[in-house]
Amino acid sequence: MAHKKGQGSSRNGRDSNPQYRGVKVYGGETVSAGSILVRQVGTVIHAGANVKLGRDFTLYSVVDGVVKYERLGRDRKKVSVYPAAAEQASA
């Protein structure tokens, strides 16, 4: 085995693809059923009304409606989707 690197050899050049995590839909926006709301690692944001948690902690909408981010207790957050008809009636 040579103790010196040969000319032009490089031990770098590997990289992984980005994960594209974060909030995909913000509060007040309208979504359709199945829309991804948040991509995350662990439950940084919890699932609220009409929102389900995927096996990779992705939060997605179950119904068509308007997104609302709310507090869950003192130090947690949750995201809910309220049907658009109910949202207009309360406004």
Curated annotation (Swiss-Prot):
Coiled coil: none
Origin species: Myxococcus xanthus (strain DK1622)
Keyword Ribosomal protein: yes
Gene3D superfamilies: 2.40.50.100
Amino acid composition bias (Polar residues), ranges on this chain: 7-19
Disordered as annotated region, ranges: 1-22
GO molecular function, one term: structural constituent of ribosome
This protein's UniProt keywords: Ribonucleoprotein, Ribosomal protein
Keyword check for 4Fe-4S: no
Protein family per UniProt: Belongs to the bacterial ribosomal protein bL27 family.
The protein's name: Large ribosomal subunit protein bL27
GO biological process terms, semicolon-separated: translation
Lineage, broadest ranks: Bacteria, Pseudomonadati, Myxococcota, Myxococcia, Myxococcales
Transmembrane segments: none
Cellular component annotations (GO), alphabetically ordered: cytosolic large ribosomal subunit
InterPro entries: Ribosomal_bL27
